[in-house]
C-alpha cells in the first residue's frame, strides 16, 4: 500500500508503520491520519499527525484499563513525533 506520492512523506509514514508490530502505531489509525494529509503539504502533515495524536489521547481517557491507556499514549507519542519531523527549528 502506498500512502503518498511524495517520497519523503511515504518514507516517514512507513517509518511510523515500523512500530506496528510492537504496538507503537496502529495501521487503521495511520491510514485515517494519512487521509487527512494533503500530499506534499508540510503544514497539512503537521496538523494531520498532531490532530490524530490528540484525538487518540482524548479517546484514551474513556478507557477503563490502564494498560489500554498506556498503549494509546505510546501510539500518540509516535504520532506527535511524526508530526514534528518536517518542522524547521525556526517554526513557532
Predicted regions and their residues:
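N-terminal targeting or regulatory segments adjacent to alpha/beta-hydrolase or S9 domains
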Residues: 1-92
